[in-house]
C-alpha cells in the first residue's frame, strides 16, 4: 500500500505543488492559455485533468497581473507583452499600425476571448515601447511562428520612415537653393552678349590677347590674366555653359571700363596692354564690312571728305576706312589679273 500510495502521489500531485520559479510558471501558463485553441482543449483525452490545471493557472495569472500593475516594468510583464503579441492576432499592436498587417496572418488563426484580459496591460506596455513616430520596435511581432506578420512589420517601418526623413522639406529645399547657382542665364542671352562684346571690342581696336592680359588690371578678386584662346572661345560660344556664365560679368566690367576711358579721351594703357608699341591689325565687324562693300560698289575711289563721312557714320577711324578702300582696290586688281591669265 505504501508503494501504491507513493506511486499515486508521484503520478497525481507533483504538478499541484508550488513551483520553484512561480513567475516563470505563471508566465508560461498564461501564454499557453492565450495561444491554445479551444478545439484542442475539447478534443483532449485528459480534458478534466487539464481544466483543473488551467483553472489554477488562471488564478496564478490573475495574481501576476495584479502584481504587474504595481510594477509595470517587471521583466515578466515585458515577457507577457512581447510573447502575447505574436500569438494573438487580435492584439493591440495590430490596431496601432497599418491595416495591411491584418491581411498577412494565416487563416487558421482564431480569435480567443481569454486573451482579452491581457490586452489592457498590453496597451500600456506597447505605447511605452513604441518609439517616436509610431514605428514599432524590432522585437514586436518578431517570433518565427509568424513570418508574414514579421515581414509586414518591416514593410510598415519602411513605409513610415519616409515621412520621418522628409519631416522638414523646406530645409532640404533651402539647401538645394543655396547649392545651386543664384541666377540662371539664358543661352540666348549669352550668345547675344558674346556677339555684342566682339563688335564693341573691334571698335575699340583691342585684340583678344589684349583683353585677356588687361583683365588682371581690373583688380577683380580671384580673376587674373586669361589667354587669347579663352576670349576667342567665349566669342565663338565654344566654352561650357558654366564658364560662359562665370566669364560674362568679368568681360562686362572690362568693356564698361574701356568704353568709359575712350569717352573721356583718356589714355589708360593698363586697360589695353602694358606698353606694347607695335601697330596692331585692325578688325572690322561684319555689319560695318557690309556697309563698306556697298560704298565701294558705288565709288571705289572716294574723296577724303567722303572717307571722313563714312568713318563718322560707321563709328570707325578715318585712317581705317582709307586703308580698307586701298586694300579693296588692290584685291580687285589681283582678281582681274588672275581671271585674265
UniProtKB/Swiss-Prot annotation:
Top-level taxon of origin: Eukaryota
Keyword Transcription regulation (UniProt): yes
UniProt DNA-binding residue ranges: 277-336
Keywords from the named record: DNA-binding, Homeobox, Nucleus, Transcription, Transcription regulation
Residue ranges of the motif POU-IV box: 55-65
Function recorded in the entry: May play a role in specifying terminally differentiated neuronal phenotypes.
Protein name: Brain-specific homeobox/POU domain protein 3
Species this protein is from: Gallus gallus (Chicken)
Gene that specifies this protein: BRN3
Amino acid at each position: 500500500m505504501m508503494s501504491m500510495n507513493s506511486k499515486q502521489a508521484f503520478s497525481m500531485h507533483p504538478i499541484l505543488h508550488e513551483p520553484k520559479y512561480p513567475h516563470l510558471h505563471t508566465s508560461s501558463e498564461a501564454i499557453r492559455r492565450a495561444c491554445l485553441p479551444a478545439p484542442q482543449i475539447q478534443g483532449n483525452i485528459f480534458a478534466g485533468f487539464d481544466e483543473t490545471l488551467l483553472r489554477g493557472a488562471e488564478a496564478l495569472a490573475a495574481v501576476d497581473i495584479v502584481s504587474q500593475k504595481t510594477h509595470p516594468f517587471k521583466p515578466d510583464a515585458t515577457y507577457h507583452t512581447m510573447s502575447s503579441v505574436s500569438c494573438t492576432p487580435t492584439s493591440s499592436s495590430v490596431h496601432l499600425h497599418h491595416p495591411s498587417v491584418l491581411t498577412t496572418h494565416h487563416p487558421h488563426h482564431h480569435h480567443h476571448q481569454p486573451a482579452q484580459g491581457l490586452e489592457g496591460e498590453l496597451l500600456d506596455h506597447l505605447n511605452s515601447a513604441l518609439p517616436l513616430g509610431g514605428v514599432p520596435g524590432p522585437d514586436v511581432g518578431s517570433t518565427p511562428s509568424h513570418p508574414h506578420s514579421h515581414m509586414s512589420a518591416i514593410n510598415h517601418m519602411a513605409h513610415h520612415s519616409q515621412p520621418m526623413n522628409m519631416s522638414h522639406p523646406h530645409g532640404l529645399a533651402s539647401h538645394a537653393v543655396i547649392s545651386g547657382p543664384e541666377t540662371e542665364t539664358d543661352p540666348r542671352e549669352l550668345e547675344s552678349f558674346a556677339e555684342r562684346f566682339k563688335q564693341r571690342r573691334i571698335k575699340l581696336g583691342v585684340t583678344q590677347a589684349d583683353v585677356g592680359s588687361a583683365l588682371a588690371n581690373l583688380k577683380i578678386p580671384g580673376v587674373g590674366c586669361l589667354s587669347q584662346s579663352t576670349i576667342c572661345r567665349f566669342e565663338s560660344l565654344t566654352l561650357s555653359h558654366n564658364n560662359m556664365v562665370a566669364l560674362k560679368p568679368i568681360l562686362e566690367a572690362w568693356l564698361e571700363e574701356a568704353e568709359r576711358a575712350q569717352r573721356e579721351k583718356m589714355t589708360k594703357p593698363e586697360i589695353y596692354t602694358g606698353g606694347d608699341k607695335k601697330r596692331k591689325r585692325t578688325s572690322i565687324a561684319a555689319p560695318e564690312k557690309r556697309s563698306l562693300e556697298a560704298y565701294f560698289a558705288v565709288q571705289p575711289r572716294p574723296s577724303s571728305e567722303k572717307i571722313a563721312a563714312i568713318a563718322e557714320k560707321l563709328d570707325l577711324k578715318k585712317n581705317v576706312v582709307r586703308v580698307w578702300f586701298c586694300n579693296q582696290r588692290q584685291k580687285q586688281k589681283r582678281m582681274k589679273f588672275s581671271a585674265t591669265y
